[in-house]
Amino acid sequence: MKLKTLLIAAAFAAASLTTASAATFRFAFQGDLKSLDPYSLNETFTHGVLGNVYEGLTKRDKGLKIIPGLAERWEVLEPTRWRFYLRKGVKFQNGEDFTADDVVFSAERSFKPASDIKTRIQPAGTKAVKVDDHTVDFILPSPNPILHYEWDTWYIMSKKWAESNNSVEPQPGAGQQMSYAALHANGTGPFIITEHQAGVKTVFKPNPNWWGKPEHNLDEVIFTTISNDATRVAALLSGDVDFADPIPLQDVDRVNASANARVLQGPELRTIFLGFDQYRDELKYSNIKGKNPFKDVRVRKAFYLGIDENAIADKVMRKAAVPSALMISPLLFPLAKDFTRPKADPAEAKKLLAEAGYPNGFEVTMDCPNDRYVNDEAICQAVTAMLARIGIKVNLLAQPKAKYFAKILVSGHYDSSFYLLGWTPGSFDSWNVLANMYACRDENGKGGNNNVGNYCNPKMEEFIKQVLVENDTAKRDQLIKAAYQLGQEQDWGYIPLHQQALAWGASQKMKIVQRADNQILFYWFRKE
């Protein structure tokens, strides 16, 4: 038996020794909780789990509506000055008082070079200023009517704790030498982390000093990484775990037919897409030397037309995905109905490649996670086969998400030529997509922090600036529409594939709240 299997078994065995009266919630995910530093990796699973421990100035309720969090209320004093009134009597888990100093520190920390959440506070150049111990002003260089839309996952950290533990700088997502904040947590939220063994298990207990009123009935939460799909499903069906995510699509009917568990399915707001290196003068992982084929719009369009997303949604995703024409879910942008995804056309794709100077195609390495999104590696395998039909030889490099993100994101200097990624706009608004995916960036992640391939167009930069400050909804939607037309229908900057469906497996004993943002917030879970 492999060491990791033994460790997982030991974790389950230890958990089973708890008293019968204790409501212990055990859950498994396909990937690891790589870091406890909430600024190191802008990833849904990480932010969701840490959202049980850390809190933002705002929160989102079960219906994703913005509600007060660590800020009791806020007001716009003028278009470029917002004031937030902080809750009094809130403490971090180590007993320190939560004050305005922590908010100012957290704002400054979010802009540090290694931070993966630089776009949480926009526009760039926004300053947090302490008014008194429980009041903070945010001074903006230009208006932003949705300033606080992403602050439910901009988690506030203790200034004193970070300074005392050499954690003023965020833990880089690719860091091998883990910082104190990457291995320990000190939040204000409903749970505290009492044990963290990366790759094995993380243990949570209720925070007895939390300022809010608990809705859960859990005495202990144990998270375990189970990367193997079959093992994860077996653990759910046997009762070794109370919750498993994701349930492979081919196992949904089997789980629903069992006596002990069921699958909670619903639409997710995440868009799965493909991206290209459009930045380097020479494509790093290719047999083409001295130039970069992806700088040619004809090549990008050829790749788009060479991929049959309808077949992927039908066969690979077993009809549990909605093909997308845009980099945002139509649930979040009303004018998405005006866009139609082009049908696959291998003949036209070959013609475009020939016109671009690649009549025989070329080779390129594709980076892909194998434990992050639903059927991620299978999607990449399908893309590889489809592109082979137009003369493109794809060398697939599929890796666990820890290695994958460390390679392709800012901490790895965007080390990819062609990649698969997923994106959920934290604000549930198109500006987040434009600012993160279409804004020009540099090698330090300034600008479009998650624009891995560095799509860059000065016209798009102007659209992004205009969208940020436009208050008229109709005018703003038209600006967003024009931006998407530029990015997709003219520049072919990305290949949006689909919005995947959620597939959470849960014990019949569990009452679960499932939101479309796919965050596992067990402070709402109850075990009967």
What are these regions (language model features)?
Residues E75, T119-P170:
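Surface-exposed binding/hinge segments that line
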Residues L17-A22:
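Sec/Tat signal peptide C-region and signal peptidase I cleavage site
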Residues A162, R318-D338, W492, A503-S507:
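Mature extracytoplasmic/periplasmic domains
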Residues A28-E78, E108, N186-P190:
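N-terminal lobe/hinge region of extracytoplasmic solute-binding protein
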